[in-house]
Amino acid sequence: YTHVLVGPASVSLLKMKFPKRAHEVATEFGYPMYAEGLRRALDFLAPLGVPIEITENGVADANDTLRTEHLKRHLWVLSQAIQDGHDVRSYHHWSLMDNFEWAEGYSMRFGLHHVDFETQERTLRPSGAVYKHIIEQH
């Protein structure tokens, strides 16, 4: 969930730039971290009266420096929305482990587990331990 600032330019959709505001933190993908976008999406969908499942919410972060904050912000916004009556049935972080991204190949690291693509060894990242703790408590 992010927002897009637009202006005149001639670019391919796959090579779009996502400018950030001065107070925003950008992910390695170039998207601003925007937890409020999750709440706005839930508020927009609420009138439909259908159960919601969040199936992909994550951040490209090879060094795992942003993912914990991303998780905390988004899960806090999600918990507030649920307390306010939104019928959210599930949340699935993107992704359990680093994987192949269709447009970016193996260059973007979304996983709660680091994957060494040469050996296939998987290692839990600190953000994965934080997520584990959060879901154990709730």
What are these regions (language model features)?
Residues 1-138:
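Non-catalytic scaffold segments within catalytic domains of secreted glycoside hydrolases
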